[in-house]
């Protein structure tokens, strides 16, 4: 009888263990299914995708607005810079300007300004370049603050500049290549210092440096 009781107890324990393991496996499977359903919830994924799409659209709109703002700012600036001068204004500028020929190709606008600054206040120096390759053409224009300074500048004709004898003439109407209907190269920069722009094909100095005095006409000019 004792052996039978022990056998029954063992069978009962085994059945109990099997039932317990079965319940645990069922619970684990249920948890895994729930986790899987949460990970691949189509509604949640759709919401996430929509939020991402909205963020991308907002970023595109922001970039487009930034581009529009830049274009508007650039357009207003360009508009101010390209306001055409009247014929009278161009002629008045020409009366205060000289043509300088045989300029060394390596010369800068600042060097020309230094060479002529003893003649009077200089508003602008422009070295013309070829539009195709950006190389200097070998001549320049100098605009003074007053037409009275032009006579002094003409006395600089045939002086040496960077080892070359330059040619200085008044900028006149009807002179080939020196028409008053043509302004200085576009894109000139106002302010002190030289500015070089290959795109606009010119090197320009703009400023107002006080005259230091001209030491007479000779083959050498000492500006200081």
UniProtKB/Swiss-Prot annotation:
PROSITE patterns: RRM. Its main location: nucleus. Keywords: Coiled coil, Cytoplasm, mRNA processing, Nucleus, RNA-binding. The keyword Cytoplasm applies. It is found in: Nucleus; Cytoplasm. Residues 1-36 have a biased composition (Acidic residues). It comes from the Eukaryota. The keyword Nucleus applies. Interacts with ZC3H3. This is Polyadenylate-binding protein 2.
